[in-house]
């Protein structure tokens, strides 16, 4: 799926089509996505969460990865919006131990780290008029 040579899968692919956790994650990401347009230093954001910048080659403006469990990596993939298309923040997973994780746990980790990234946005943009969600974490 990407140029990094790893199979990247969604929570829906891990849990199945009826995954309630994919809907939970999608809703949480949609509410927070606009704030990530304020990220000026992607490397700094990656360090803030203990992750690293990755180039997945899927048309993203930036993506970060974070190992959340031995053999389980989460990828936060951001695409800036423009006049024609809205922006998006998506999450994908990879790793040899992905199938031993519960969807509920993966969703929890995703939301936890996205909220932590919002703190970074708030701390690095002290004078900006940020989306309200940045002030709720």
Feature map (PLM): residue ranges:
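Negatively charged, low-complexity tracts enriched in Asp/Glu with abundant Ser/Thr
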Residues: 7-62
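Amphipathic, interaction-prone secondary-structure segments
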Residues: 52-80
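Short, highly charged C-terminal tails/helix-capping segments
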Residues: 124-137
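Intrinsically disordered, low-complexity regulatory segments enriched in Ser/Thr/Pro
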Residues: 77-105
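Short, surface-exposed, charge-dense and proline/glycine-enriched linear segments
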Residues: 32-39, 85-96, 118-124
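Conserved aromatic-histidine-acidic binding/catalytic patches
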Residues: 30-33, 64, 98-101, 105
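A recognition module on extended beta-rich or small alphabeta surfaces enriched in W/G with H and D/E
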Residues: 95-125
């Amino acid at each position: 799926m990407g140029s990094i040579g790893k199979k990247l899968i969604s929570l829906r692919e891990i849990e199945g089509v009826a995954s309630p956790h994919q809907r939970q994650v999608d809703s949480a990401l949609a509410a927070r996505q606009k704030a990530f347009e304020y990220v000026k230093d992607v490397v700094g954001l990656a360090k803030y969460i203990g992750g690293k910048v990755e180039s997945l080659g899927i048309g993203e403006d930036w993506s970060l990865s974070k190992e959340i469990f031995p053999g389980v990596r989460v990828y936060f993939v951001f695409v800036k919006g423009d006049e024609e298309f809205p922006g998006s923040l998506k999450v994908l997973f990879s790793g040899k131990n992905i199938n031993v994780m519960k969807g509920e746990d993966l969703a929890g980790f995703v939301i936890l780290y996205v909220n932590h990234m919002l703190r970074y946005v708030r701390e690095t943009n002290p004078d900006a008029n940020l989306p309200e969600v940045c002030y709720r974490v």
